[in-house]
Amino acid sequence: MPATPAPASTPTALIYFGKPAVRFRLDARALGFDADGNARWLVLTKFFDAQGNATRIMANSDIDWRSRDGYVQWQTRLRYGQPAAILKTQRNGPLTMNVRANVPRLGTVTVHTDTRTWHGPRIVAQVLGPHAVAIGWFPRESTMARIVRIDGRGRRRTLVVIAGPSSSYRDETVLPGQHYRYVLDRADHRPVALSPVTTFPPPPATRVANAGGKAMWLFFTTNPIDTIYYNNLDPQAIVAQAVRAGLHYVELRTAYGAYWEVTPEAKPTIDAIIDGLAAHGIGTIGWTVPRDTTVEDLRQSLRTAYYRTAKGTPLTGLAIDVERGDEFMGGAPQGPSALWQYVRDLRAALGPRYLLVATVEDAYLEHLTQRQYPYEQIARYSDVLQPMAYWRMMRRKPTTPVQVDVLLRASYAKLVREARRSMPISIGGQTDNEGRNGYPPASEITASLATSKAVGAIGECFFDWDATQPAQWDALAGYRW
């Protein structure tokens, strides 16, 4: 039996599990039809070495995914094991995707499908938490759609009659823990009765104070080549460090887009961290990174809000990272409005009482106003705003404690103006060395904490755990909050 190949770096900085690739092919499959009224098509790359054996790229590939037939979103390689993309479309008919491998440079492969040949339900109802149900139909209706809801007592209610083009509807008048059935009636179609659905029970109790005090962002991967691979995490050491630093909570990433990161293999380690922190009175706020306003993406944030460890420990709130850019919400078809629409939809699904922290781009450091970023709308549906005030990353030259004080005061003040309301703010501070200016020294960590507290912030959460240096941990431990 041949030995298992070890991950190896190539001269082009590609990291393989196996030998370098010389060609690739595409595996494509229909993912079916969703509650947003879309057809979804998965296209996955498969790489092969010179001997024709399968090889796996672990990092640093560059793939272009192109189609004129819908919206294409690339997927983290961790979700499907290799570079992949999902096309969503409301087009009923032939679909084409061109995939070009830039790194490694292996040319372009084209793949085709036709939604008219797909099997599976084309009308879907899916629960979105305790307060919303999404109903989608494919293909798009052009004339009229009527949706009737039947509750657990058999009472019928016409929810909406949509005139003109339509493909989905969200019922935000449902109650927690209830059974519902829906009937969709469309022009020139027979009425379709959908399978019963049951809404979620109320989410765990939370409060705004859970997002106060000192905190740290913590994330991990399931890729064994990464330093933050979950198997490299030491739950006891993490808990001990959090206790020593006097942290009030940890923001732990659970989902990236529609990819749920707490895999069955990682769950025991992640649960041990959450349980260990809770034993010392330290909360864990779930952190998700939305990439689209789809039901599939929203359900990962909802899954986070309802997450419990094997011992039953709940999370203490939800923080959503609403950013522009291709790795975040920048590619969403709605453009910048997707940022606030996601927050609105999540609030509607969860209800008004669950702690929702919106991690937002810094208005002052990034020179943003309401015209470029929807601060006011995001604030309307959030309990806490958390600006990413990464003072060294955003500057051309290294800063001093005095400059940190000036920058954070300006950051706080501008966010209040852009939000156009008085509400809790937790500063997002910096411990990592991202950017040209290196790690903030301990004196700047202390200055940022002092300024955050002085201006009225409820706390400061630092990015990020893995990059935080011993002197920075000492500074955190030395400041009481």
Predicted regions and their residues:
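Short S/T/G/P-enriched beta-strand
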Residues: A3-A54, N102-G120
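Pro/Thr/Ser/Gly-rich low-complexity, intrinsically disordered linker/stalk tracts
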Residues: T117-S142, P176, H189-A205
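Boundary/entry segment of secreted carbohydrate-active catalytic domains
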Residues: P203-A242, R253-A255, P290, D432
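Aromatic-lined carbohydrate-recognition surfaces of secreted/lumenal glycan-active proteins
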Residues: M216-F219, G283-T294, W340-Q372, R421-E434
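Active-site groove signature of glycoside hydrolases
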Residues: H248-A258, T304-P336, C461
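Aromatic- and acid-rich polysaccharide-binding/catalytic face
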Residues: L315-T316, V322-D326, R371-D405, F463-T468
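Glycoside hydrolase catalytic-domain groove-lining segments
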Residues: R344, P352-L356, V384-G435
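Substrate-binding cleft of secreted/luminal carbohydrate-active enzymes
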Residues: A389-M393, P424-W481
